[in-house]
A protein has these predicted regions:
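Generic structural signal for beta-strand residues in well-ordered domains
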Residues: 8-9, 25, 50-52, 77-78
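Short, Lys/Arg-enriched N-terminal segments with co-localized hydrophobic residues
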Residues: 1-3, 51-54
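Basic/aromatic-rich interaction segments and small domains that mediate binding to polyanionic partners
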Residues: 5-6, 10-44
Length: 167
C-alpha cells in the first residue's frame, strides 16, 4: 500500500506513516500503520474528507427470506460502511445477514428476543432495543411481515436511515 499521509500519534508524539484510515461513529480518526498496527486516536474530531465514519447497521427482514444472492449483492455494496452488523437472531434475513458478516470479518452484535420474559411482545421489544442501539437499518421485506414493518417504522420514527429491499 502507498502512504496516504503522515500524522502525529497523540499517545507517543511520533510522526507516523498512514496506510489506511478508519473513523469511528463520533468522527474521531484511527490510522492504520505498517504491519496492521493501529495507532491510538491520532486526532480529535478529525476525519480525512475521503473517510466516512463506520456504522452499526441492522440487517433484518422476514423469516421467509432465503435468497442469499440478493442479500450478498445488496450488502457487498455497503461492506465498507459496517462497523458492526446488528442481528436479531431470527431465521431468514437475520441469520443470512450474520452469515454474510462472518464471511467479511465484520463483528456481529446479537440482540435476540426474550420470548420467555416478554411473550408475544418480545420481537417488538427487541426491535426497539436494536433501533436504539444501531445507526441504520437495511431491511429485506416482502411487504407483509409485521415484525419487519415495525423495525422499519421504529427506525424512521427515530430519524435513522432505512434502506428497504423488497422481495
Amino acid at each position: 500500500k502507498q502512504i496516504m499521509f503522515k500524522v502525529k500519534d497523540i499517545k507517543t508524539n511520533e510522526i507516523v506513516q498512514v496506510l489506511d484510515t478508519h473513523c469511528d461513529e463520533y468522527g474521531k480518526a484511527w490510522f492504520l500503520l505498517w504491519k496492521d498496527k493501529w495507532v491510538w486516536r491520532a486526532a480529535d474530531n478529525y476525519c480525512p474528507p475521503n473517510v466516512v465514519p463506520k456504522k452499526r447497521i441492522i440487517v433484518a427482514g422476514g423469516r421467509n427470506f432465503k435468497d442469499y444472492h440478493v442479500m450478498r449483492e445488496a450488502l457487498d455494496k455497503r461492506v465498507n460502511d459496517f462497523k458492526e452488523l446488528v442481528c436479531g437472531g431470527a431465521r431468514g434475513a437475520d441469520s443470512l445477514g450474520a452469515t454474510w458478516a462472518r464471511t467479511h470479518f465484520i463483528p456481529i452484535k446479537y440482540m435476540e428476543a426474550d420470548w420467555q420474559a416478554h411473550g408475544q411482545a418480545a420481537g417488538f421489544i427487541r426491535n426497539h432495543q436494536m433501533g436504539d442501539y444501531a445507526d441504520e437499518l437495511i431491511a429485506f421485506w416482502d411487504g407483509k411481515s409485521t415484525g419487519t414493518k415495525d423495525m422499519i417504522d421504529y427506525m424512521q420514527k427515530l430519524g435513522k436511515p432505512v434502506d428497504v429491499i423488497y422481495f
